């Protein structure tokens, strides 16, 4: 298998209907929650005041049960993904379903909203760009090197699902595909409007080509200081890349042996552009994981040193 295959638009990019550059009006402002944990460094904070007294005004009950992602919200809509492969947009005022879009695999991270568009990574190995107001497909890009399906904890998925979420910054879409380093890890930067490839890194999963060991795509992407950060499994984590070029900037794979004390949690965030906070639940785990309980570790950016865990 050619793990370092180079992606091309002719092979990977599918264009939907209508004009890619023109989308329905959809207002997004700084008070909206347009990305997972509120921003690209995942601070999970907002300047918006929340009332002390609240009351329920509606409740959404799906026709069929599914495990939802967390929500993002903007333009009067609330967006959810789900393990049933669907992306849903609800009216924020009434809870009424506005539109749904079915992908080919489980969606584990919420849509990212940018300039009238909603971006989704799916377990089918594709990155999707939808019109946020209507759910119209603008384009989709196959991040997986080939079309291949396997069973992953009860769901039919690509061997290389896009579970990193989709990060959008300065008009560029970033996402990673893969499960375990042994099968390869694939990180892309795409034009947010057209889906065209700006750069790709197909080698960080095999920093040691003979052992096929390196970075695994084990969590959501974050950005800070001109770098992309990603939980990378039990050999290298967090993984770090140059956001402009895709060059891998972290340590090597060593002898390829798993670090039994490695923090394999799927969450990552940046504090004051100085510290990486990494941890939480494992990417593939039950809510009560007795084998490897979740924890959070802190790393000083630039030093690579652990400054504590909880």
What does each model-found stretch correspond to?
Residues 1-72, 77, 86, 96-103, ...:
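Aromatic (tryptophan-biased) beta-strands that constitute blades/sheets of beta-rich domains
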Residues 33, 64-87, 101-128, 155-188, ...:
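Repeat-blade elements of multi-bladed beta-propeller folds
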Residues 52, 83, 93, 114, ...:
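Short, ordered coil/turn segments that flank beta-strands lining enzyme active or ligand-binding pockets
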Residues 91, 131, 191, 242, ...:
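Structural recognition of the beta-propeller blade-terminating site
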């Amino acid at each position: 298998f050619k793990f370092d295959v180079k992606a091309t638009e002719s092979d990977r990019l599918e264009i939907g209907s209508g004009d890619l550059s023109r989308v329905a009006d959809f207002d997004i402002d700084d008070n909206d929650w347009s990305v997972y944990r509120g921003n690209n460094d995942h601070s999970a904070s907002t300047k918006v005041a929340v009332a002390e007294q609240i009351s329920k005004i509606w409740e959404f009950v799906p026709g069929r049960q599914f495990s939802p992602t967390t929500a993002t919200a903007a333009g009067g809509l609330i967006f959810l993904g789900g393990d049933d492969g669907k992306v849903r947009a609800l009216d924020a005022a009434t809870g009424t379903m506005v539109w749904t879009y079915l992908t080919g695999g489980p969606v584990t991270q919420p849509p990212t909203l940018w300039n009238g568009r909603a971006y989704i990574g799916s377990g089918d190995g594709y990155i999707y760009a939808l019109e946020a107001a209507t759910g119209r497909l603008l384009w989709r890009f196959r991040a997986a090197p080939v079309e291949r399906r396997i069973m992953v904890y009860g769901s039919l998925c690509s061997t290389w699902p896009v579970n990193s979420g989709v990060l959008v910054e300065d008009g560029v879409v970033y996402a990673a595909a893969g499960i375990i380093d042994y099968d390869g890890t694939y990180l892309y930067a795409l034009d947010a409007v057209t889906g065209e490839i700006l750069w790709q890194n197909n080698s960080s999963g095999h920093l040691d080509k003979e052992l096929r060991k390196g970075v695994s795509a084990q969590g959501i992407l974050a950005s800070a200081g001109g770098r992309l950060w990603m939980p990378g499994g039990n050999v290298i984590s967090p993984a770090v890349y140059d956001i402009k070029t895709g060059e891998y900037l972290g340590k090597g794979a060593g002898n390829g042996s798993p670090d039994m004390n490695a923090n394999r949690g799927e969450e990552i965030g940046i504090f004051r552009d100085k510290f990486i906070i990494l941890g939480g639940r494992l990417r593939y785990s039950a809510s009560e994981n007795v084998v490897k309980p979740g924890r959070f570790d802190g790393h000083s950016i630039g030093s690579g040193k652990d400054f504590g865990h909880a």
